[in-house]
């Protein structure tokens, strides 16, 4: 039986990447040892480390002005690290609240400095993305923080908002490299790797080089971006296997036609599942309003909790795992990140149609 992995993260990885990692597991780059045994100072690993930054920039079409850092601690550490470095005592940062992870980022920033809420969709249980006209920025924010995709609620920014020239800081953990984006609008982008870029354990940061000089100097060494930039992300021992896997995934994305190719593929996949919802006669109810729907996380409910439990049990029995929704929304969540195949979403849509038909 084929198993389709709809987990929200750690999530599905490209089968070809797993096969390559399997082949090289005991002999990395002709060394005769595993990458997990290789010194992070070895030239073979440093080559991988450098390849990651080169591939990352190539996919975005940028040659200079930015650094790619490979950190640890997940996006949750970034929630605090960003304001520690860039939110001064007499400054304000604007936060747009579209879900749980944006709330967590705001909470950490409030411990460090002044935070202004530019918009929030909390009253609607975060079922949509605020419109441009709803955004009320403070007079002179040092940055505007947003979460580009909301895994729990199944919403996603369809375009980058205008911020009057203020740099955007974005948590892209769940949709990074699922589509192109204009790096010039961002001062800093961060993402845990475990949804679209590889296994858990690596946090990727794209940061403008001029921001490296702006960082506070009284921040502990490991929490300064400049520390990691100066040391090529090798200040301390990195998660070498995670970095190696990240490099393989980036190469795979390039092979799929880059970010434009991924965007086209992800749109096709998402449409398959959303069509199953929209054509169900109301049996399936999407949580997100139509113009805020995520292409990465499709969230929906059934008429009763009992039917939801039955749906999840039968889907699992047919090889579709990781579908239970987050407790904040309940129901079903299908995470269809870059590596999810079109066959996977078609299997889910077919199951959805048959399940609804059985209920009469």
UniProtKB/Swiss-Prot annotation:
Positions of modified residues (N6-(pyridoxal phosphate)lysine): 195
One example GO MF annotation: pyridoxal phosphate binding
Record text on cofactor binding: Binds 1 pyridoxal phosphate per subunit.
Gene Ontology BP terms: L-serine biosynthetic process; pyridoxine biosynthetic process
Domain of life (superkingdom): Bacteria
Chief site of localization: cytoplasm
Catalyses which reaction(s): O-phospho-L-serine + 2-oxoglutarate = 3-phosphooxypyruvate + L-glutamate; 4-(phosphooxy)-L-threonine + 2-oxoglutarate = (R)-3-hydroxy-2-oxo-4-phosphooxybutanoate + L-glutamate
Pathway(s) this gene product operates in, as recorded in its UniProt entry: Amino-acid biosynthesis; L-serine biosynthesis; L-serine from 3-phospho-D-glycerate: step 2/3; Cofactor biosynthesis; pyridoxine 5'-phosphate biosynthesis; pyridoxine 5'-phosphate from D-erythrose 4-phosphate: step 3/5
Record-linked CDD domains: PSAT_like
Cofactor(s) required, per the database record: pyridoxal 5'-phosphate
Signal peptide feature range: none
Annotated pyridoxal 5'-phosphate binding sites: 75-76, 101, 151, 171, 194, 236-237
Subcellular localization, as worded in the UniProt entry: Cytoplasm
Keywords (A to Z) from UniProt: Amino-acid biosynthesis, Aminotransferase, Cytoplasm, Pyridoxal phosphate, Pyridoxine biosynthesis, Serine biosynthesis, Transferase
Protein EC: 2.6.1.52
GO cellular component: cytoplasm
Pfam families in alphabetical order: Aminotran_5
Binding positions (L-glutamate): 41
Function, as annotated: Catalyzes the reversible conversion of 3-phosphohydroxypyruvate to phosphoserine and of 3-hydroxy-2-oxo-4-phosphonooxybutanoate to phosphohydroxythreonine.
Similarity field: Belongs to the class-V pyridoxal-phosphate-dependent aminotransferase family. SerC subfamily.
NCBIfam families linked to this entry: PRK05355.1 (NF003764), serC_1 (TIGR01364)
Subunit text: Homodimer.
Protein name per Swiss-Prot or TrEMBL: Phosphoserine aminotransferase
């Amino acid at each position: 039986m084929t198993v389709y992995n709809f987990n929200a993260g750690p999530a599905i990885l490209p089968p070809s990447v797993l096969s390559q990692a399997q082949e090289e597991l005991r002999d990395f780059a002709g060394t005769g040892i595993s990458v997990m045994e290789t010194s992070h100072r070895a030239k073979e690993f440093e080559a991988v480390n450098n390849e990651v930054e080169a591939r990352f920039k190539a996919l975005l079409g940028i040659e200079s002005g930015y650094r790619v850092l490979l950190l640890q601690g997940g996006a949750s550490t970034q929630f605090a690290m960003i304001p520690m470095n860039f939110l001064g005592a007499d400054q304000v940062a604007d936060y747009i609240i579209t879900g749980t992870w944006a709330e967590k980022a705001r909470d950490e920033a409030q411990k460090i400095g002044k935070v202004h809420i530019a918009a929030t969709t909390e009253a609607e249980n975060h079922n949509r993305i605020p419109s441009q006209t709803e955004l009320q920025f403070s007079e002179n924010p040092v940055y505007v923080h947003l979460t580009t995709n909301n895994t729990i609620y199944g919403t996603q920014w369809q375009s980058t908002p205008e911020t009057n020239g203020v740099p955007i800081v974005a948590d892209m953990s769940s949709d990074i490299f699922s589509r192109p984006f204009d790096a010039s609008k961002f001062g800093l982008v961060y993402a845990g790797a475990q949804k679209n870029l590889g296994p858990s354990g690596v946090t990727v940061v794209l940061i403008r080089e001029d921001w490296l000089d702006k960082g506070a100097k009284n921040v502990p060494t490991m929490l300064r971006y400049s520390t990691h930039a100066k040391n090529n992300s090798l200040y301390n021992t990195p998660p070498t296997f995670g970095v190696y896997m990240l490099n393989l995934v980036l190469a795979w994305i390039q092979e799929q036609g880059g970010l434009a190719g991924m965007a086209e593929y992800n749109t096709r996949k998402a449409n398959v599942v959303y069509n199953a919802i929209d054509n169900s006669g109301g049996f399936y109810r999407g949580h997100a309003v139509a113009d805020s729907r995520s292409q990465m996380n499709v969230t929906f409910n059934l008429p009763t909790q009992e039917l939801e439990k039955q749906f999840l049990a039968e889907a699992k029995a047919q090889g579709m795992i990781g579908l239970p929704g987050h407790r904040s929304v309940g129901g079903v969540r299908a995470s269809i990140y870059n590596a999810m195949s079109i066959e996977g979403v078609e299997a889910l849509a077919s199951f959805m149609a048959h399940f609804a038909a059985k209920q009469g």
